[in-house]
């Protein structure tokens, strides 16, 4: 029997207070473990204790189901000796942790219901529930289908790392729902779907040989086929749009499925993920110089683990404890051997690359330069930078931080408009049928 989400969240808080961060890490849904090491949890908690003093009381948790897939977000108000905050724990339908945040005290109550962005017109399209793929690892999704009639251009959305739902819910934001409704309002059919690590996290966790290809390719290929076979869709204009790790993997998807007409790469990384994680932890630590020293042991441990992945001695037998975040070697062997920019260059398909200027997770200097080096001289490749946007393509000012994601906002209308214009006008060479 699955434990109630509120009980799970309170247990996690108890573990944090007792310093049992390795046990919390074991509760993470795979491959979320590839994003947040136990040392990072410990450093974040230690920083709050240094800043606010010991915990003096724990309030009543508030649970919020977030829609299809069974994800529940639990918010626990916590009072410290010198302040308050909210511990936000996301629990999947089968009991895994999909995320932990130390949020401001104002986040103790759930946000209001998601509201459509101004650029979405629900009267111009219909949302339809679909199943993507077949067999035990099929995943539920939503097809946003314009009412204007076909043949329509269409796009399948690939979300980033971790157990993402079809809306790519991050904090109080739903960037994929924004994007889907915005594109459908402009005449593009959009298919978004729960990741296999979200819909079937417990089954995936049993597979030690699980790779990045397993994480994306089966459902992405099925989504492309679903769109190509839909009577309202132009089979010669079915695209893939990937965000974050989904953008990194999009060229591999297109290589595996030649019917893909082109790619939209949204903040896709070209720096290896295990080194990007080190950079991100260092950046987050720099936002608060008073507690930056607490992150140094985490950064040193992550650096050692990243070097192990790069080592020629890495093999399937390498102990999990020596690898980033305890994720088994097959995942890293697959990811290490993949060069996304080279894969994109080999495709010979039109590509739109969009990047936020304030993004600290995927950056101009560390990642966009990789795409530019391989693709900038290609006439069928368009690269656009939105200076004010963060990793979710939400505009803002000043240094970006994880706290931004707790503020309900919408994807930049300029990004949605540019993607829609590109999808509806780009020249493709894939036969319609």
Where is each model-derived feature located?
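N-terminal cap/lid segment of alpha/beta-hydrolase-fold proteins
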Residues: 108-150
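Short beta-strand/loop motif that positions the catalytic acidic residue
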Residues: 347, 353-355
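Accessory cap/linker subdomain of secreted extracellular hydrolases
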Residues: 262-346
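Conserved alpha/beta-hydrolase "acid-adjacent" motif
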Residues: 360-366
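Cap/lid segment of the alpha/beta-hydrolase catalytic domain
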Residues: 157-215, 394-405
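Alpha/beta-hydrolase active-site loop
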Residues: 209-230
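Short solvent-exposed beta->alpha transition segments
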Residues: 7, 22-69
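Catalytic active-site module of serine/aspartate enzymes centered on a nucleophile-bearing elbow/loop
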Residues: 389-392, 397-433
């Amino acid at each position: 029997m699955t434990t109630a989400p509120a009980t799970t969240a309170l247990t996690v808080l108890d573990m944090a207070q007792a310093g049992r961060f390795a046990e919390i890490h074991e509760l993470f849904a795979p491959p979320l473990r590839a994003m947040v090491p136990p040392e990072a949890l410990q450093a974040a908690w230690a920083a709050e204790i240094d800043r606010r003093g010991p915990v003096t009381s724990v309030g009543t948790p508030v649970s919020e189901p977030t829609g299809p897939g069974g994800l529940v977000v639990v918010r626990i108000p916590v009072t410290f000796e010198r302040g308050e905050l909210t511990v936000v724990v996301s629990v999947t339908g089968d009991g895994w942790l999909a995320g932990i945040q130390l949020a401001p005290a104002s986040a103790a109550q759930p946000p209001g219901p998601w509201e459509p962005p101004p650029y979405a017109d629900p009267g111009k399209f219909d949302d339809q529930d679909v199943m993507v793929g077949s067999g035990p690892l099929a995943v539920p999704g939503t097809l946003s289908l314009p009412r204007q009639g076909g043949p329509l251009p269409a796009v399948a959305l690939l979300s980033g790392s971790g157990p993402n739902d079809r809306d790519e819910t991050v904090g109080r934001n739903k960037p994929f729902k924004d994007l889907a409704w915005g594109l459908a309002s402009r005449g593009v059919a959009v298919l978004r779907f729960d990741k296999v690590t979200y819909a079937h996290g417990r089954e995936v966790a049993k597979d030690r040989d699980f790779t990045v290809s397993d994480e994306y390719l089966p459902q992405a290929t099925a989504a492309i086929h679903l769109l190509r076979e839909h009577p309202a869709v132009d089979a010669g204009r079915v695209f893939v749009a990937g965000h974050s790790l989904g953008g990194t993997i999009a060229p591999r998807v297109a290589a595996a499925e030649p019917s893909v007409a082109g790619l939209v790469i949204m903040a896709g990384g070209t720096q290896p993920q295990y080194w990007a994680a080190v950079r991100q932890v260092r950046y987050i630590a720099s936002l608060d110089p008073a507690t930056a020293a607490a992150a140094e042991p985490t950064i040193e441990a992550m650096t050692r683990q990243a070097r192990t992945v790069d080592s020629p001695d890495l093999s399937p037998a390498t102990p999990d404890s020596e690898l980033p975040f305890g994720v088994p070697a097959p995942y890293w062997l697959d990811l290490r051997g993949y060069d996304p920019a080279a894969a994109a260059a080999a495709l010979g398909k039109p590509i739109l690359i969009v990047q936020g200027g304030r993004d600290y997770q995927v950056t101009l200097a560390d990642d966009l330069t990789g795409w530019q080096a391989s693709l900038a001289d290609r006439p069928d490749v368009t690269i656009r930078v939105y200076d004010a946007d963060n990793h979710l393509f939400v505009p803002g000012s000043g240094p970006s931080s994880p706290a931004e994601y707790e503020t309900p906002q919408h994807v930049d209308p300029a990004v949605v408009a540019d993607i829609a214009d590109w999808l509806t006008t780009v020249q493709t060479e894939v036969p319609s049928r």
